[in-house]
Amino acid sequence: MDNLYTGISKSIESLPPEITFSYGYIFTNFKKLKWPWLNKRKIDNVYLSNHFFFILQEDAMAYAIEVLIFFSSELSVFYISKADSTGFFNRHGSPSPLKAVISTFLSYLIRRFSRKNIPSRISLFSRSQPQYLFPSSSLNPSKHILDDRELVRWWLKVLDSVNGSQCPKKYVLIPGMDPRETLKYTPQHVDTDLNWICGHPYESMGQSAGEIIPRFPDDPKTRFLDQLDRDGEVVSIDKFWELMAFRQECIHGRIVGFFSLEFPGNDQDGTNNTITEDLDLQNGIQINEKIYRMVYEKLLRSDFETLEKSKGATLDLINDINNSKDIKDSVDWIKKVSGKKTSEDKKRKAIDISEQLKPVNILNESLIRKKSKKK
């Protein structure tokens, strides 16, 4: 992938030009983590960067995703914190581009922020909710809220298309569901190395679950680990997942999914690019952590029930970013992309198919027996 803009443009080029939208991407610099990541009793030497990507259509937020990137000495973790839609995206009768765009964004992050000889992991917990990022968007009748099973399938398709410099191992775990049923949700590949594994990536060399499972904000694994700490319990990694099936997030007849993509370390370091290079490559803008936090918290207090309210909330958020001292007046960080498939492309494809379907005479003339004349 050359850069984020090129990648997103390519991901939707098979869609018609009517599919037009803009996107924005903001992120913060890495700062030392202020809470325990592995060991509850001490602050680990881990660094965190926040990344927020959003899609606009008709000047209103349509979709957004937040990814938290953690750097430890042994692992880079890309934790998908939250993702949500408003229901204000006009597909014009075409397939939705959202899965392809989000896969492209995650692929960009993996390539851009990979570190030399250090493995990377994408981590995600999915649970169906009416809204995550956009308050009151659940009141919009146009918003299609995926149920628990639909959401698991949606994320499996998104993550299945994520590409790093090397192919990842892909893990999915649905607490309380047996492996055979779980794998029915996953995309299947002719190359079995590309198929999903029912399980988790955490390998224990005698350590307890609390020593090898990182802690993330607003994450059910973290809540369970904290509960175990308060109760003074130490459990193995296998016991941890066995008990997780009985946690509040995983019961009441609804399924939840835990996903992990494991990318091996490589000999290239993607973190050497400077901020200036990122701006030239149209790869988003870095802003101050305080501004990021202010914008994010304002988002969670906004109203996205109607299109007009969504436009107003979107404009306020973008103005807050533009008015910060981190943004130069000349920087155009909101990028517009469109599908490129035309009616001529469709016609040409139809002609190609009809040509393939034409019968072809493959008989040799010498093999055709001529009918003898009657005497």
Curated annotation (Swiss-Prot):
Record-linked SMART domains:
KAT11
Task: Please list the residues that carry the modification N6-acetyllysine.
Answer: 221
The UniProt entry's GO CC annotations, sorted and at most eight, read: nucleus
Q: Name one Pfam family in it.
A: HAT_KAT11
Positions contributing to acetyl-CoA binding: 125, 144-146, 154
Q: What class of enzyme is it?
A: transferase
- Please list the residues that make up the active site: 219 (proton donor/acceptor)
Q: GO: which molecular function terms?
A: histone H3K56 acetyltransferase activity
Q: Which reaction does it catalyse?
A: L-lysyl-[protein] + acetyl-CoA = N(6)-acetyl-L-lysyl-[protein] + CoA + H(+); L-lysyl-[histone] + acetyl-CoA = N(6)-acetyl-L-lysyl-[histone] + CoA + H(+)
In terms of InterPro entries, this protein maps to: HAT_RTT109-like, Histone_AcTrfase_Rtt109/CBP, Rtt109
Q: What is the effect of changing residue 84 to A?
A: Abolishes histone acetyltransferase activity
Nucleus as UniProt keyword: yes
Q: Which UniProt keywords apply?
A: Acetylation, DNA damage, Nucleus, Transcription, Transcription regulation, Transferase
Q: Which GO terms describe its biological process?
A: DNA damage response; regulation of DNA-templated transcription
Subcellular location(s) per record: Nucleus
Q: What is its main location?
A: nucleus
Its Enzyme Commission number(s) read 2.3.1.48
Q: Which family does it belong to?
A: Belongs to the RTT109 family.
Q: How does it assemble?
A: Forms a complex composed of two RTT109 subunits and one VPS75 homodimer. Interacts with ASF1.
Summarize the protein's role: Histone chaperone-dependent acetylase that modifies 'Lys-56' of histone H3 (H3K56ac). Histone H3 'Lys-56' acetylation may be required for S-phase-linked DNA damage tolerance. Also acetylates 'Lys-9' of histone H3 (H3K9ac). Autoacetylates.
Database matches in PANTHER family: ALTERED INHERITANCE OF MITOCHONDRIA PROTEIN 6, HISTONE ACETYLTRANSFERASE RTT109
Protein name from the UniProt record: Histone acetyltransferase Rtt109
Q: Which organism is it from?
A: Pneumocystis carinii
Q: What is the lineage of its organism?
A: Eukaryota, Fungi, Dikarya, Ascomycota, Taphrinomycotina
Gene that codes for this? Rtt109
